Curated annotation (Swiss-Prot):
Self-association state and partner proteins as the record states: Component of the mitochondrial large ribosomal subunit (mt-LSU). Mature yeast 74S mitochondrial ribosomes consist of a small (37S) and a large (54S) subunit. The 37S small subunit contains a 15S ribosomal RNA (15S mt-rRNA) and 34 different proteins. The 54S large subunit contains a 21S rRNA (21S mt-rRNA) and 46 different proteins. mL44 forms a heterodimer with mL57 and stabilizes rRNA expansion segments 1/2 at a membrane-facing protuberance close to the point of attachment of the ribosome to the translocon in the membrane.
Gene3D superfamilies found in the cross-reference section: 3.30.160.20, Ribonuclease III domain (1.10.1520.10)
PANTHER family listed in its UniProt record: LARGE RIBOSOMAL SUBUNIT PROTEIN ML44 (PTHR11207:SF32), RIBONUCLEASE III (PTHR11207)
UniProt-recorded name of the protein: Large ribosomal subunit protein mL44
Keywords assigned: Mitochondrion, Ribonucleoprotein, Ribosomal protein, RNA-binding, Transit peptide
Transit peptide residue numbers: 1-59
DRBM domain span: 302-372
Function: Component of the mitochondrial ribosome (mitoribosome), a dedicated translation machinery responsible for the synthesis of mitochondrial genome-encoded proteins, including at least some of the essential transmembrane subunits of the mitochondrial respiratory chain. The mitoribosomes are attached to the mitochondrial inner membrane and translation products are cotranslationally integrated into the membrane.
Entry's family note: Belongs to the ribonuclease III family. Mitochondrion-specific ribosomal protein mL44 subfamily.
One term of GO molecular function: ribonuclease III activity
Native organism: Saccharomyces cerevisiae (strain ATCC 204508 / S288c)
Location (main, coarse): mitochondrion
GO CC terms: mitochondrial inner membrane; mitochondrial large ribosomal subunit; mitochondrion
Amino acid sequence: MGIVLKRAIAAGMKPFPNSTWHWSRTIRPFSQHLSSTCFLQQSSRFTSKRYLHLSTLTQQEKRFLPESELAKYKEYYQGLKSTVNEIPESVASKSPSLRTLHKRLQLPNELTYSTLSRCLTCPSAKLPDKINNPTKGAAFVNTVPTNKYLDNHGLNIMGKNLLSYHVTKSIIQKYPRLPTVVLNAAVNAYISEAVLAHIAKYWGIEVETTSVLSRYLKMEPFEFTLGRLKFFNNSLNSKDGIELITGKNFSETSALAMSVRSIIAAIWAVTEQKDSQAVYRFIDDHIMSRKLDITKMFQFEQPTRELAMLCRREGLEKPVSKLVAESGRLSKSPVFIVHVFSGEETLGEGYGSSLKEAKARAATDALMKWYCYEPLAQQEPVIDPGTVVV
């Protein structure tokens, strides 16, 4: 390095000129005697930028798909989009998921596989243009735009009305004296979103979670997509321990519940003329067959007062609480047994560690027997006057 500097100075050149080009030109003939590290450190800034620019372009070119592969992907995407928007019966009938679900639920033959696939397409699968614009790079990789005329929006509304009507009717026929608040709670316990979503999972409805690109790389047939539930959150990446809170129609629970309601509406649509009771039998088998303890839904704030008002409304004698038995009144844990009477008829009984507690439990027992009364099939329908106002 010293010899190089001496020759440069003898030639009338400064060792560190202002021009980077001169310095690089001076040392370039002797660069073969220098280490690569030293040469790179003294090289031109423009040369370094040019090298980085070329390397970046090379890396970008490596990431791009070949034109032929990109054309195949576009063709697959357009075919998938056309299939989802039209749902041809010839393609839907080949779906293993649809055929299995149809057989598992014992759906009528009039309900086609394309209609069943429509029940699994939520309206939220068609995203707004603001958040699904491929030209602006805002498209979701898992979402295929759907036809608004082939989603389950209308079926969901019809199925919700059918469920509300039949479940309410069944509960009132079984418990005609239920208060309105308890009746609404019982209906919600049968057909709430969480319950219907659990039923959908029990039926085996699958959710579409793979991206379109993954389906293309696997060359997945289009009928596989028709047999899965499609909704907004198909396009969101799930992370462990993080739950994204969005609109109700965008959650997986809402989408699963909508699919159940839509299937019920589809059954009614294809069997209403031939067998109008088929959809109600389906609801009884899959919805009303679950056990519900109606007694757990009651909570009385003033049971003795409410019982007195009930007896007055029904024309019964004023209820009277009587101590029937007791044990250990002066001990640490006494027990009192109280019965409540209306004339000579026993309405209810209760126990407790104090007379007040036993009296309240006896009144509660009498109210439960009244509200949870189940008439026999041979009896005339019972019409209750309404809720007791305390």
